[in-house]
Amino acid sequence: MAMQMQLEANADTSVEEESFGPQPISRLEQCGISANDVKKLEEAGFHTVEAVAYAPKKELINIKGISEAKADKILAEAAKLVPMGFTTATEFHQRRSEIIQITTGSKELDKLLQGGIETGSITEMFGEFRTGKTQICHTLAVTCQLPIDRGGGEGKAMYIDTEGTFRPERLLAVAERYGLSGSDVLDNVAYARGFNTDHQTQLLYQASAMMVESRYALLIVDSATALYRTDYSGRGELSARQMHLARFLRMLLRLADEFGVAVVITNQVVAQVDGAAMFTADPKKPIGGNIIAHASTTRLYLRKGRGETRICKVYDSPCLPEAEAMFAINADGVGDAKD
């Protein structure tokens, strides 16, 4: 009997070892959830067991054909497969030490970010036009494909473009700089143009389905807020806009948690025209208000320097000190500023 228990325990550990990373939703079928219900979950945009485990019960009940009793059972089974309880700070520290950072292409900028853009969290870059937001995004779309020992993420990139500023030629120039095959680099970037705020959110459901199929290291949304400025106007629609934006950012955070991808979003700025603006040296602030401020893990403020030089400042971060770094925009992507 003891021997049999030992064998079962070994089998369990081997299953656990195999299920490194997100688990496909089909795993729930082995736990007694009917194939029909699993199909309904998949159609509603749940492609992994983690997505189900992290979802509030209300969200599952809203799916046609899922009753409250079924939702309880599904959540109970998902919770068995996904560790969601307390853990010691030691274990968490160990997990944090395994987080990969993706190089930005500039040594100074990487030093400021203590290694590069962090995976598994949201990094927001905001600034005026011509401050290098889109150029950093293009460079990251290539560097995330590099091997880990070269500062990459060994994965594909996903690019959601809402402003029509994506240029594959820029990717080819960066690929040449790193000695990568141009055609392979372009094949590894999934591109989508977002046309309105609902479409932008819909693209994230497709993104989650694609992330189950193959390994992605980076998700870029450039810009996350541009369409919100045009789809919603005036104070009357402000609360509806913020609720929609909060839902979009929540989905981004869920993708970062589920798949461990680095999420990079760009944001626009608005000039402050109130009385306080007279007393601030730089009267610009990022749009999206507190909702976007709380959703982003790291916020970077970009501004122009002399010539091709740009300055990046850590505006808000849980662990990076408030400091600045200079970088340059070159023909082959983002690099270090020349003295």
From Swiss-Prot:
Gene Ontology cellular-component terms listed: centrosome; chromosome; condensed chromosome; condensed nuclear chromosome; cytoplasm; mitochondrial matrix; nuclear chromosome; nucleus
Source domain of life: Eukaryota
Entries under PROSITE patterns matching the protein: RECA_2 (PS50162), RECA_3 (PS50163)
Chief location: nucleus
Localization, UniProt: Nucleus; Cytoplasm; Cytoplasm, Perinuclear region; Mitochondrion matrix
Phosphotyrosine PTM positions: 54
Residues bound to ATP: 127-134
Protein name: DNA repair protein RAD51 homolog 1
Organism per entry: Cricetulus griseus
Name of the gene this protein is made from: RAD51
